[in-house]
Amino acid sequence: MIVDRYYYHQLNKKEQAIYKAFYNGVMAYQEIIPIPVSGEFTHNSFEHIFMALTRDNPLIYFLNQSACSIAHDIFGHIAICPQYFFSKEKIKEYSRKIEKVVNELAGKLHLLECSDYEKELRVHDWICQNVAYDYEGTDKDKVSRVIASHNILGVFAYHKAQCEGIAKAVKVLLNAVDVKCIVVTGTAGKDGNMGPHAWNIVNIDGEPYHLDATWDISLPESMRITYDYFNLTDDLMNLEHNPENVLPKCNKGSANYFIKNRCDFQTRYTLLKYIQAQIEHGKKELLFLSLIHISEPTRLRRI
């Protein structure tokens, strides 16, 4: 397992000190966490550090951001007063169960016996085959459902989550087998209909790539695994995704699923030749990347 804290390293020294104190405090389930800062500490600063902490550490799934507060005393001391979704005993119980599930998956998928690319592929495929998108995960009348859906509990306990929970689970699984992975937040959408979204940047053979497992999840009845958003470059990803933070540049394409499997095509001749050969071999469904005579790449064509 690796400790992979990308957002911590984007903070200044003062923010990093607060991040560390906050992390140590919540891992000890403290109700009042003194922080090493004097002077002004705004709610915006707190939110910035909170987001860095929870994206770097998806195993901190039990914090209620909207209910956390900042306390000041007459001597100028400042403390964070966190609110936890669950009791200390429940958090320990859930954390043990999550650790067990992650370890069992690492063994079942043989994640310690393969390349980083193969680890990512197997985690992606497991998510796509075993996790459904939770369309009720924003229903305010179902508070426990919302809590689970937006963190790793949704994936590991209920096999149903929204994009944030899925992206965090991907990071937990990949970090557990020594693959660097970032949770990315921003907006995404098609045809101009943008909304909040979360996905990942995964480091494969020293190069970062975008991975959106949520958008690769098919409808339950199709039972397909798709690879539309498996290891994309910035140019491809930014057609429909807008990250809100400064991120590593994703400029290499060699670990893209279609390029890796030699089913990416830039001429009509090579594409038609590929289709003909696959049909002759009895294939009824083809997945490929086409970059032919179009201004915006078409990631997937099914035949």
Give residue ranges: language-model regions.
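Linear, non-domain "peripheral" regions
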Residues: 1-104, 299
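Short glycine-rich, basic-tinged beta-strand/loop micro-motifs
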Residues: 25-39, 276-291
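Conserved structured core elements
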Residues: 117, 146, 160-164, 168, ...
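Gram-positive cell-envelope targeting signals
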Residues: 123, 158, 163-165, 169, ...
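Hydrophobic/aromatic-rich core segments of domains that either
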Residues: 165-235
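Single conserved hydrophobic/aromatic residue that forms the stacking wall/gate
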Residues: 292-303
